[in-house]
Amino acid sequence: MTKLFTPLHVGRMELANRIAMAPMTRYRASDNHVPLPIMKDYYAQRASVPGTLLITEATTISARAGGYANAPGIYNDAQIAAWKEVTDAVHAKGSYIYVQLWAVGRPANPQLLQAEGGYDLVSSSATAVSADAPTPRALSETEIYAWIADYAQAARNAVAAGFDGVEIHAANGYLIDQFTQDICNTRTDAWGGSVQGRARFALEVSRAVVEAVGADRTGIRFSPWSTFQGMRMKDPKPQFEYLAVQTAKLGLAYVHLVESRIAGGADVDATDRLDFFLRAYGKASPVIFAGGYDAESAVRAVDVEYADYDAIVGIGRPFISNPDLPFRVQNGIPFVPYDRATFYVPKDPKGYTDYAFSAEFQKAIEAAA
């Protein structure tokens, strides 16, 4: 009997299974970064197995933190109201939903930032994401504190929108990761120059969010091994060991780790393990593991590979084409393949809300009615 379908207490939630929907950018918000009605349908469909945790796509904490067209935000009243429709629909299915709080930093589109408010392209340092990319401006210390306040306000907005909690996006080469890793952060002030200095932004953001909404409504995501968007410091272990130790002290709802075999949305050949982080973090909270999992490897992760931890498996792309995914895993029903060509088509329901539930799931729902 696998632990994958045994309950687990996470923060303020009582999950019925240990499969979470991992965060995935889909660009189905309006041009003003307001969630469209199809987003409500999309998340409600994937909440259909009661007691499942969904983590939203990356959602910008403020207008200046954006720079991606048709990505949602959580910084104004229209966005909060639209997200409330989403969270109500998810809760009506008996499931849970966290919003992923996001500041883009140097990979943002500078033209879009200018058009949407005259905002600069910024980062920890004036270090471009690649040789042919624009060079960002380094944030001043005064600005850093203002951005930390943006995270806290976004967390409060999330609770107002009905979210069960928030996940701080500290992974995949976005702004927090740009402070964390020395491949980007070349600062010599208190926000860089050492393991402690580089970790400071992530930890100050975490503390501010915890103060705003509570540790039991806060998670954080790290990707120590990812090469996505110019990341991967030479030896990430000391940096992320320190973050693990310090994060463990905060008593968060969970920590979310990206396996080395995933770089952004791509599969890569990699064998670097997360054991070093887990040893430093201990058993401070449940841990979500994400990275190319299928039904078989998800069972192995919770029962064997991470059996000593309260492990949750984050599954992304297969959840797109299998809205009843936890039911399929539990009942040995094959996954429907996804269509990568529809992943990022702005505002389009095709490949978004048109994937069917399995016949077996539909029968189970009818029988329970």
UniProtKB/Swiss-Prot annotation:
Pfam families, per the entry: Oxidored_FMN
Coiled coil: none
Keywords, comma-separated and alphabetical: Alkaloid metabolism, Flavoprotein, FMN, NADP, Oxidoreductase
Binding of FMN, residues: P23, M24, T25, A58, Q100, H169, G292, G316, R317
Chemical reaction(s) catalysed: dihydrochanoclavine-I aldehyde + NADP(+) = chanoclavine-I aldehyde + NADPH + H(+)
GO MF annotations, alphabetized: FMN binding; NADPH dehydrogenase activity
Binding site for substrate: H169, N172, Y344
Active site: Y174 (proton donor)
Record has Oxidoreductase as a keyword: yes
EC number: 1.3.1.100
Listed cofactors: FMN
Pathway: Alkaloid biosynthesis; ergot alkaloid biosynthesis
The protein's enzyme class: oxidoreductase
A GO biological process held by the record: indole alkaloid biosynthetic process
SUBUNIT field: Monomer.
Function: Chanoclavine-I aldehyde reductase; part of the gene cluster that mediates the biosynthesis of isofumigaclavines, fungal ergot alkaloids. The tryptophan dimethylallyltransferase ifgA catalyzes the first step of ergot alkaloid biosynthesis by condensing dimethylallyl diphosphate (DMAP) and tryptophan to form 4-dimethylallyl-L-tryptophan. The second step is catalyzed by the methyltransferase ifgB that methylates 4-dimethylallyl-L-tryptophan in the presence of S-adenosyl-L-methionine, resulting in the formation of N-methyl-dimethylallyl-L-tryptophan.
UniProt family annotation: Belongs to the NADH:flavin oxidoreductase/NADH oxidase family.
Entry protein name: Chanoclavine-I aldehyde reductase fgaOx3
The organism of origin for this protein: Penicillium roqueforti (strain FM164)
